[in-house]
């Protein structure tokens, strides 16, 4: 089971609030629930990200966090390799995940349980979230959702942008694909069928749609006030 990760967190996408919680804070809470113990937060906008990380939060209090700064621009694979824990043999797989997106906890649990380098993709985005995921990059296996489990030997042999590396890895089968569309619909804890969801931080015009998706994921029927605050 993977227990370390690198979180890619930049303002403004990582600080978009949905149901009163930033996408970064929501991700940190989800990662703790998925068994992640240590996270390095890599940011080109460290000041606002540091301010968000400094907020007290019991829901991710057990998660050890380290903030690192990077140059502005697209994330490069070399930047990920530089952050790899010193003993790469002890950490064969590292989760790399963007904080500017929202993920169904079931998807992240499934991803961190993989035993080989794997990228989360979606070959058939559901109609409800098509507007929210339209900006996500396309690959030969479907939409690139963002999270990936990377192996040190693979990552250190690459050069260039992270997104291009993931796309090429999928195209050449050096990285496996975990397809959102192939995941079970039944949500055991909710006792209902619900397609597993993901989406980048929404624009202002799509914010209400994103919040409806989140609220629907935690209950049946119309949303109530307690659900709003715990979404």
Task: Give the residues covered by each predicted segment.
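Conserved beta-strand scaffold positions in the cores of enzyme catalytic domains, especially
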Residues: 15, 64-69, 74, 94, ...
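Structural motif
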Residues: 8-11, 41-46, 70-71, 96-101, ...
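Short acidic, S/G/P-rich loop/turn micro-motifs used as interaction or catalytic elements
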Residues: 11-15, 30, 46-48, 73, ...
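Short phosphate-binding loop-to-helix
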Residues: 48-104
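Conserved core of the sugar-phosphate nucleotidyltransferase
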Residues: 53, 89-91, 101-181
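Left-handed beta-helix
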Residues: 1, 43-46, 101-103, 168-231
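Surface-exposed alpha-helical segments enriched in charged/polar residues
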Residues: 29-33, 82-85, 109, 113
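N-terminal glycine-rich phosphate-binding loop and ensuing alpha1 helix
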Residues: 1-50, 63
